[in-house]
């Protein structure tokens, strides 16, 4: 069984389908009034105005790959067609066709990566979430982990898309784009400088040992407040009764559209701890989606530099009146304390009904002091990012 998408964007487990060449042509001709089938540079294509459409069916990669991984095969002869069309001033599209029952989605793969590859066949990949997004919102564009650009388009939107009618972007993405311009500046952030900034602002978690995540929260909260952006995104530090216990509230005017969580993660880690699985599931069921906004950083540990930063941090906490539960120890948290971090990359991951079970690998996080098991948590597995990636910055470098 593989992932399939239903009419409302829901996930269905079923066998893969197979389309004949004639059926693929019919699906394109139905979506593009005025298009014709013709032969161009020896290849059967669909011609739509000044555009040459080369098409393949989107299918699952096969075992042992996860059910969400899909692709089209790009034959080497497409490169000849692309070169000829470009020489004649025509636009070439490498299009994948997904069809399941009454759902048809087209995926436009930017040819620029694939024309540079020397192999006889290349694979262009797409994930279940790309299909879900297109079915729900009409058009969805992203850059995958290898730097490839792809746009998924519902069948009733294809003509508008090919003629330049791009769907408007979610305005909340611009909030993060502007924040990234400040945070992802390549500068190293020293621990003592960060905690002193939080202390000056009265930030509640200024004394916490895992300071990078709390510093990220502090910076983002200050940014959206200073920029009067709370009507789009609010950082929810003080959780209120009756509301979900998540960091981010995404709004449309006074109403809540959905929730999210803001996380800092070491760039070398393959996974990032998430939230209670039941809470995420309820949130997705109520609002349709949940966003994880992850900022990855490189790390310098104090233990690799004589614990100087650890001692300075502990001394500073004592100097401003902080009293721990144990007797003062200048080497408290020495094994894990981060001397500095450099935020280098951010990504927005969407959890929804089509990827909930795959995007998050569940795990049990030990036991309570009384021996009872802790609530089931979720783990963000970075290997599966392409099945829930909404936005990333900076864009990955293309692999040729």
Predicted regions and their residues:
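Nucleic-acid endonuclease domains
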Residues: 2-244, 254-258, 264-400
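Short glycine-biased active-site loop of nucleotidyltransferases that positions the nucleotide triphosphate
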Residues: 247-251
